[in-house]
UniProtKB/Swiss-Prot annotation:
This is Uncharacterized protein L388. GO terms for molecular function: 3'-5'-RNA exonuclease activity. It comes from the Viruses. Pfam families: Exo_endo_phos (PF03372). It comes from Acanthamoeba polyphaga mimivirus (APMV).
């Protein structure tokens, strides 16, 4: 199975950016999907924007995929949204779940972030059946808040939300934009039988990356950030490969697909 993970960078401030507005980047994302041909796609930051197409319209240009999109606060404009898309010729979606990173995770709710900018954060999961093997596995997509206390509480709640859905021996891929590389994340998941798969994260020309968030280019064309925020974890996953589907020089000098790098996961 091949999974592509990407925060598509639809923050509300991007709508009028001369370089990073959605109209400049949407086709770059489609080109990336067509080049990599993943079986499953995980998108974060699929927010609605006032002055451009919704992600539901965008997904019409990926006709080979069925998809699930969930909003943190349905009907509220600034809701955060996640997508899990999949190739229906290879996979059957058995079930789907959405939970909230909050004190009431079973119902639409805001979390522990800044009250003026908290529109809820969710985890979206799907169980799939491979048509050619009858093997089942779970895929979970997450996007944490940027607030430090919200991140901490989300980390501690995360294993419980997953374990309530999955059997102890279920094969699981957990990926997304965690907005942190804090040791608490890695230790908490390790203590709950998750392996950190994305420690071996290279470009296509085998340059090791310790960064997944590169920010926007400045007026001189230089990338402005170097944080490691996007991670992949697995349970009962033993044969896998993780990479960024671009060469290092392209990332440094030309990449504008998003402020995050895409991560590709291949697993058996």
């Amino acid at each position: 199975m091949k999974v592509l993970n990407l925060n598509v960078f639809r923050g509300f401030h991007t709508q009028f950016h001369s370089v990073y507005k959605w109209e400049n980047r949407r086709d770059l994302i489609i080109n990336l999907i067509e080049a990599e041909n993943p079986d499953i796609i995980l998108f974060q930051e699929c927010n609605k924007l006032q002055n451009t197409e919704d992600m539901e319209k965008f997904m019409e240009d990926l006709p080979n995929y069925d998809y699930v999109i969930k909003y943190s606060l349905p009907g509220v404009f600034r809701s955060r949204a996640l997508i899990i898309a999949y190739n229906p010729n290879k996979l059957i979606k058995n079930s789907e779940i959405v939970k909230w990173f909050s004190d009431t995770p079973d119902v639409p709710s805001i979390g522990w972030g800044n009250p003026d900018d908290d529109f809820g954060r969710i985890i979206l999961g799907c169980e799939f059946l491979e048509k050619n093997s009858d093997k089942k596995f779970w895929i979970f997509n997450v996007h944490f808040d940027i607030d430090v206390e919200s991140i901490r509480k989300s980390i501690l709640l995360l294993p419980e939300l997953i374990d309530k859905q999955c059997l102890s021996d279920s094969k699981i891929i957990l990926a997304g934009d965690f907005n942190t590389d804090d040791k608490l994340l890695f230790d908490t998941l390790k203590n709950n039988n998750f392996d950190r798969l994305s420690q071996t994260f290279n470009t296509t020309d085998k340059v090791k990356l310790n960064v997944s968030f590169v920010g926007k280019r400045d007026n001189f064309g230089k990338l402005t950030e170097d944080l490691y925020l996007d991670h992949v974890f697995g349970r009962e996953v033993y044969n896998y490969n993780i990479y960024c589907p671009f060469e290092y020089d392209f990332i440094i000098n030309k990449y504008i697909v998003s402020d995050h790098l895409p991560v590709v996961i291949i697993f058996e």
